[in-house]
Amino acid sequence: VKRLAIYCGSATPSDPVYIENARFVGRTLAERGIGVVYGGGRLGLMGAVADGALEAGGEVIGVIPTALVNAEVAHRGCTELHVVETMHQRKQAFTDLSDGFVTIPGGTGTMDELWEAMSWAQLGYHSKPVGLLNVTGYYDGLIAFVDKMAEVGFLRPMHRDILLIDDQLDSLLDRMAGHKVARPIFSMSSSEL
């Protein structure tokens, strides 16, 4: 794994543990020689992930829509900053530039990114690992929901296993490195989207 897309919130949460953890994620990836691909922002968890990686000498590739650059929320310290026109182009770039995906706490945009990475793997658009870091139980409800989808038959058990879940970053990264691809429903390329 050379680079991982990190999905996370751009907001500053009320509990500083989330910012501290985001900085830790960035720093740990840099120390492992893994580049960060992320939303290109300087605020919230996004900024903390980038800062942690940059402070540890890591590669940070931001992908941000023009509208957010114009709103002056872009992180100017990125190793590379890719400016795109649409959110779809942004998410496609995350897939194209990374070898896998890690979701840490965030809001609806983060959920959109996670669901897309998971559903694209399910459909065979990519075969990259999809990880969920459950910081202080933040995603307990989401995990229960995913399990419920599998229980009632809306998610095949083999596709439930696409989502690798852990509350410790190092063990999540180790599991992602040993990732075995689930059999997709279809076999497609991302150019067929």
Placement of each model-derived feature along the sequence:
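Active-site/ligand-binding-proximal alpha/beta "capping" segment
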Residues: 89-124, 131, 182-189
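A cross-family phosphate/adenosyl-ligand binding-site feature
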Residues: 1-97, 135-170, 174, 180-193
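Alpha-helix capping at helix-to-loop junctions
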Residues: 110, 120-126, 148-151, 155, ...
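Flexible, glycine/proline-enriched loop segments at strand-loop-helix junctions
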Residues: 104-105, 129-133, 160-163
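Glycine-rich phosphate/nucleotide-binding loop
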Residues: 104, 125-128, 136-141
